[in-house]
Amino acid sequence: MDLIYFIKAFFLGVIEGITEFLPISSTGHLILIGDWINFSSNEEKVFEVVIQLGGILAVCWLFRDKIINLINGVLKSDPVAQRFAVIVMISFLPSAIIGALFIHDIKNVLFNTTVVATALIVGGLIILWVENRKDSEKFKIENIEKIGFKQAIIIGIAQCIAMIPGTSRSGATIVGGMLSGVSRKAATEYSFFLAIPTMLGAAIYDASKNYHLLNTDDILAILIGFSAAFISALIVVNALIRFVAKHSLSVFAWYRIALGLIIFSVN
């Protein structure tokens, strides 16, 4: 393997780490950029799983204190911790069920540049609409522990829609939260928590299906991609939490729309 191959692995790891938690669609970017740089690997599916694990690990590290407190609270029968754990599972289960049943059909039918471009534009327009509603700043829920069953269900449904490449899991769940009365900052933080079981579940499922593709010749490239995703996700998650506390998501909406139009213009 040459140096260019490892550079491509690093580049895709960075793209995964940056785009996974921004409302701009990591899957869409990986599809587009993977084709653009002609990245091919005998274990391409395994590579995608591993770099997603890098992003998951970054979130777990950043929220380690809250995660430990949550686990301890659940084990000690703390009602607040147990309620929050149930809320997260309610948001997680719809996508877990639909993903397990239809993920292969979704990938076979929807994983193409036309769908990605369309979803980017439509998602961008929805974000602009949500951010510019007259009641957009009248949120009732400012703390993730106050998120209720109604909000959890709406966010869970939104996450199902995000299975369409180009939609963005984080974007859909944040918008779902905001539409149900959760503040932008709280919706963003909840989206990160929800990402842990969602991405971990998807990674375990994909790994169980594709572990036989693992080849020791690509271990170094996989480790490079994993490390790049982990470090870039650490930076992005921290930055996004600070950003959404003071700014709207409109800048990401315009980026999505512009990228979608560019994709249509070159295809």
Swiss-Prot record:
Database matches in Pfam families: BacA
Reactions the enzyme catalyzes: di-trans,octa-cis-undecaprenyl diphosphate + H2O = di-trans,octa-cis-undecaprenyl phosphate + phosphate + H(+)
Record-listed E.C. numbers: 3.6.1.27
Record keywords, A-Z: Antibiotic resistance, Cell inner membrane, Cell membrane, Cell shape, Cell wall biogenesis/degradation, Hydrolase, Membrane, Peptidoglycan synthesis, Transmembrane, Transmembrane helix
Membrane topology of the entry: Multi-pass membrane protein
A single cellular component GO annotation: plasma membrane
A GO molecular-function descriptor: undecaprenyl-diphosphatase activity
Enzyme class: hydrolase
Residue ranges of the TM segments: 4-24, 43-63, 84-104, 109-129, 147-167, 186-206, 219-239, 243-263
Compartments, record wording: Cell inner membrane
Chief localisation class: membrane
GO terms for biological process, alphabetical: cell wall organization; peptidoglycan biosynthetic process; peptidoglycan metabolic process; regulation of cell shape; response to antibiotic
More info: Bacitracin is thought to be involved in the inhibition of peptidoglycan synthesis by sequestering undecaprenyl diphosphate, thereby reducing the pool of lipid carrier available.
Function (record text): Catalyzes the dephosphorylation of undecaprenyl diphosphate (UPP). Confers resistance to bacitracin.
NCBIfam families documented for this protein: PRK00281.1-2 (NF001389), PRK00281.1-4 (NF001390), undec_PP_bacA (TIGR00753)
Family recorded in the similarity comment: Belongs to the UppP family.
Protein name: Undecaprenyl-diphosphatase 2
UniProt source species: Shewanella oneidensis (strain ATCC 700550 / JCM 31522 / CIP 106686 / LMG 19005 / NCIMB 14063 / MR-1)
Organism placement in taxonomy: Bacteria, Pseudomonadati, Pseudomonadota, Gammaproteobacteria, Alteromonadales
Name of the gene encoding the protein in the UniProt record: uppP2
